[in-house]
């Protein structure tokens, strides 16, 4: 049996809560590897804006902090959570730190890469837009700002 993205379970960024991604079945998802000390970190603002705009229509952003690229994330989850909340007002779900390369790579991101044919997570803030059926609709690199995804998100929400 092949795993789907809904078969994955991850610990939330703070606290002991573990969340199964089945909770997000039938939603349009934007899955992003994030970092608090990166030149692309201001994208948190755009990600939160998308989440606020579309969450009532069945859209969710899922953030996965990572220090895989130049250690650009805090080592303590609480610092990451505070940074995101204080500086960018982040309310979308954030999960515990994940590896984005090597043998310990987050299995969800391995699956997302496989679906898109991309070879690797190239840097922080790689984005995967996932349809309600759980398939990757499109991959966006770090340089693509969240605001540029609005028409694709609306298209998927209207399906």
Listing of model-derived features with the role each one plays in the protein:
Residues 1-22:
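N-terminal "domain-start" segment that seeds a small globular fold
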Residues 20-22, 52-53, 117-121:
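Surface-exposed acidic, glycine-flexible loop patches that form ligand/cofactor-binding
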Residues 23-29:
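Proline/glycine-enriched tight loop/beta-turn segments at coil->beta junctions
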Residues 29-31, 62, 128:
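Conserved hydrophobic packing residues within short motifs/helices of P-loop NTPase cores
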Residues 107-110, 114-159:
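Thiol-/selenol-based redox modules, centered on thioredoxin-like
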């Amino acid at each position: 049996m092949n795993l789907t993205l809904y078969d994955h379970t991850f610990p939330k960024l703070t606290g002991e809560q573990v969340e199964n991604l089945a909770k997000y079945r039938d939603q349009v998802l934007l899955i992003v590897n994030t970092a608090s000390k990166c030149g692309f970190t201001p994208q948190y603002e755009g990600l939160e804006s998308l989440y606020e705009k579309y969450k009532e229509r069945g859209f969710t952003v899922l953030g996965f902090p990572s220090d895989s690229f130049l250690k650009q994330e805090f080592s303590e989850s609480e610092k990451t959570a505070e940074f995101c909340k204080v500086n960018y007002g982040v309310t979308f779900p954030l999960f515990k730190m994940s590896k984005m390369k090597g043998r310990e790579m987050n299995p969800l991101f391995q699956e997302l890469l496989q679906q898109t044919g991309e070879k690797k997570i190239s840097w922080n803030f790689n984005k995967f837009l996932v349809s309600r059926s759980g398939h990757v609709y499109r991959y966006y690199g770090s340089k693509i700002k969240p605001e540029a995804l609005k028409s694709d998100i609306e298209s998927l929400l209207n399906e």
